[in-house]
Amino acid sequence: MQDTIPVLTIDGPSGAGKGTAARAVAARLGWNFLDSGAIYRALAVAAVDRGVSREDESALAALAASLDLVFGADSTARILLWDADISGRIVTEECGNLASKLAAFPAVRQALLDKQRGFRRPPGLVADGRDMGTVVFPDAPYKVFLTASAEVRARRRYNQLKEKGMDVSLAHLTEEIEERDRRDRERQIAPLRAAADAVVIDSSDLSVDEVIQVCLSVVQSH
């Protein structure tokens, strides 16, 4: 039954605009929304709070399996971990970098696989991540791979963090994004790549609205 529920996967590197596009497309279609990156970031928060070593794969996998996460249904993008709002904590670069490292552990990815697939509920799902179309929902009828140059993605991230009042360096952000790209591409389990049947979109010169329209057209043209 579950595999008959339509899924649009939106994969791509950090800062490509996946989250903004996926949330907007889900709202337009009236579908459920999965931010898989937020799940890994929530695990990073939980590991820090529970004092679990970032090198202890089995303990991290057990922690991943125990996560109790709730995504806010509204546009505020609130995320609750064990009933505590962690929305502000998961947006830091430190959290993102730790999440990327934890995601390289096969046991962690396996523990979170069923949790992610559980978001596939009627009437449909828009799933945002790195391996949604290749590993988590390989049978999804609609797939997008959203990318942009490292420089453009770093500038977008820089502007986001400055708006939040954070003191950040554009050069440092660019280096971190390039390092995260390399780590995501080269990991042995579920490396970052476009699914063979995905529509590849370079958002470097596109507005947010243009990206949303292209994603919607992928669903509506079928």
Curated annotation (Swiss-Prot):
This is Cytidylate kinase. Belongs to the cytidylate kinase family. Type 1 subfamily. It comes from the Bacteria. It comes from Methylococcus capsulatus (strain ATCC 33009 / NCIMB 11132 / Bath). It is found in: Cytoplasm. Pfam families: Cytidylate_kin. One of its GO terms (cellular component) is cytosol. It catalyses: CMP + ATP = CDP + ADP; dCMP + ATP = dCDP + ADP. InterPro entries: Cytidylate_kin, Cytidylate_kinase_dom, P-loop_NTPase. Keywords: ATP-binding, Cytoplasm, Kinase, Nucleotide-binding, Transferase. One of its GO terms (biological process) is nucleobase-containing small molecule interconversion. GO terms for molecular function: ATP binding; CMP kinase activity; dCMP kinase activity. ATP binds at G12, P13, S14, G15, A16, G17, K18, G19, T20. Its main location: cytoplasm. Gene3D superfamilies: P-loop containing nucleotide triphosphate hydrolases. Its EC number is 2.7.4.25.
